[in-house]
């Protein structure tokens, strides 16, 4: 009679350490979103989580490691959302949005950008300086982060190329330019400026940023899809 092996249960101490790391990462995520990497301090993170600075260093050795952990969490969250989006209507090339037929690929690009802006307005989108070499090195050395980033880029890239083939996004733009344009929405200062003005609701801000972003990427109305395919 064979005995079934039960998965080993985590000890109470291991569960507590994991819960603390999640709390630390959530705090870092929020502080990076609100203040950015340069202004955020390790003392702030420790105080917000309610632990001593020395205890925090038992989990993460540096400020760069803290930021890296938050970015891993963010990229994995983005990957999960995009994978779910990719699974929807996989066999279809057209979707009906507000009574009009549009490209499924374009619809997914817009949905992913809208999701990014919603997180940003909710203070859940960490932003990092591009010029910090030690931070960049930490991210480049993180396998979970790089794997997630590659998968996210592959998914978005495939939708961009498809939308260009279908004549919805300007094919004169290199796909990498479109990809970076969409990535830039995660750190777009226009979103913060509009929110600080208190003149518009979050949904209005999202619609305005979506319009300025995608209207610049779309094929012009006077350019027919037929002309696009013949060039």
Regions found by a protein language model. Name each.
Residues 69, 83-122, 179-182:
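Hydrophobic alpha-helical connector segments
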Residues 110-111, 115-140, 191:
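Amphipathic alpha-helical segments used for helix-helix packing
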Residues 50-60:
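Short hydrophobic/aromatic patch on the recognition helix
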Residues 1-35, 39-48, 65:
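Basic, helix-initiating cap at the start of DNA-binding domains
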Residues 67-74:
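Alpha-helical DNA-contacting segments of helix-turn-helix folds
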Residues 1-7, 107, 111, 154, ...:
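C-terminal peripheral helix-coil segments that are non-catalytic and often amphipathic
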Residues 79, 83, 123, 137-166, ...:
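Amphipathic alpha-helical packing segments from all-alpha helical-bundle domains
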């Amino acid at each position: 009679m064979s005995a079934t092996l039960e998965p080993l249960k985590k000890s109470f101490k291991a569960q507590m350490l994991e819960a603390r790391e999640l709390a630390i990462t959530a705090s870092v995520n929020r502080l990076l979103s609100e203040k950015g990497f340069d202004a955020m301090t390790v003392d702030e993170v420790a105080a917000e989580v309610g632990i001593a600075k020395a205890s925090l260093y038992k989990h993460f050795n540096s400020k760069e490691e803290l930021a890296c952990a938050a970015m891993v969490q963010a990229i994995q969250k983005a990957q999960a959302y995009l994978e779910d989006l990719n699974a929807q209507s996989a066999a279809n090339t057209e979707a009906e949005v507000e009574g009009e037929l549009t490209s499924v690929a374009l619809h997914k690009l817009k949905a992913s950008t809208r999701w990014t802006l919603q997180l940003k307005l909710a203070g859940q989108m960490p932003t990092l300086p591009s010029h910090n070499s030690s931070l960049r090195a930490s991210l480049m050395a993180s396998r979970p982060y790089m794997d997630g980033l590659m998968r996210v880029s592959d998914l978005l890239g495939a939708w961009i190329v498809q939308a260009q083939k279908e004549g919805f996004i300007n094919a004169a733009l290199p796909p990498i330019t479109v990809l970076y344009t969409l990535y830039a929405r995660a750190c777009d200062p226009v979103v913060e400026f509009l929110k600080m003005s208190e003149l518009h609701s979050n949904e209005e801000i999202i619609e305005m940023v979506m319009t300025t972003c995608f209207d610049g990427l779309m094929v012009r109305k006077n350019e027919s899809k037929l002309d696009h395919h013949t060039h």
